[in-house]
Design a protein with these regions (language model features):
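NAD-dependent ADP-ribosyltransferases
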Residues: 1-140
Length: 140
């Protein structure tokens, strides 16, 4: 991920700490009346189809992509010191820091998706990802 002030830069790009809506995370536009006060999707009988539309991050199999090993990264994601041609540093995080609104799910032997724990407002999910910024450490 790109670096800013010694930590991963936050944003909506494959090179940033975050997700690209509709690419990395499934989203839907739903009336705000379908969300509770904490911006989580209400159970269907409690949803009110009223209010402005808001983007929600759908809890499914998608999320922010993370590799479990340097070796499994494509060359364009690895900096030269790791045998690649990528321009951004590599970062790591203790999986114990992925808590609250986030869940780290290993979906292959070499890959993890950091997903929303439940369906929630996209803004809430993106804020939860951004709040992990201080826990990421550069890999040298």
């Amino acid at each position: 991920m790109a670096e800013q002030n010694g930590k991963p830069k936050i944003g909506r790009s494959a090179r940033l700490l975050g997700v690209r809506p509709t690419i990395d995370i499934s989203i839907e536009q739903i009336p705000v009346g379908c969300l509770d006060e904490q911006s989580y999707l209400l159970p269907e009988p409690q949803r009110k189809l009223q209010g402005d539309l808001v983007a929600v991050a759908i809890r499914n199999t998608k999320g922010m992509s993370v590799s479990l090993s340097i070796e499994s990264l494509p060359a364009f994601r690895k900096p030269s010191q790791f045998g690649g041609n990528g321009k951004d540093p590599l970062w790591q995080i203790d999986d114990n820091m992925i808590t609250g609104d986030l869940e780290a799910v290993q979906d292959s032997p070499t890959h993890v998706s950091i997903m929303p724990r439940v369906t929630m407002a996209l803004e809430k999910y993106e804020a939860a990802l951004a709040n992990t910024q201080k826990y990421w450490e550069k890999v040298d």
